[in-house]
């Protein structure tokens, strides 16, 4: 059964070791990068919730949820950042290890992430956004099938 677990000292290295196919490396940051980013924003107006994705006791992927408070944007010059991120949640990262793709784990993990977001850990919000590389058709179709809609905003090249 698919479930999420917080990243901690007992599972960090097995999550860092998960990899995507070479052809997918440009679609998602390495898990260690995401974990460092989560650590780096812990004292800012951004919240990060990094999770390991497990199938029973086997680690199969990584997911990170973000939340950006309005204070983050008050003096921010990044004109490329979508305004829909203000006071809203985001599915910041999602990766399934190359050995476990095409088994429905990504879909189930997103559903669990949305359940977590509905607990409002940083307060209520209007949206949950995400971004993906335009070339990543598999991600686009997965997100659409779960009810996500494109709104025309971009986050850099995503």
Please provide the spans of the model-predicted regions.
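Acetyl-CoA-dependent GNAT
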Residues: 2-99, 110-112, 116-122, 155
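Non-catalytic interaction surface on structured domains
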Residues: 87, 124-127, 143, 147-149
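Active-site acidic-Proline motif in GNAT/NAT acetyltransferases
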Residues: 97-103, 134-135
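Conserved beta-strand-loop-alpha-helix junction that forms the acyl-donor binding cleft
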Residues: 124-140, 156-158
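Conserved active-site alpha-helix within GNAT-family acetyltransferase domains
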Residues: 107, 134-152
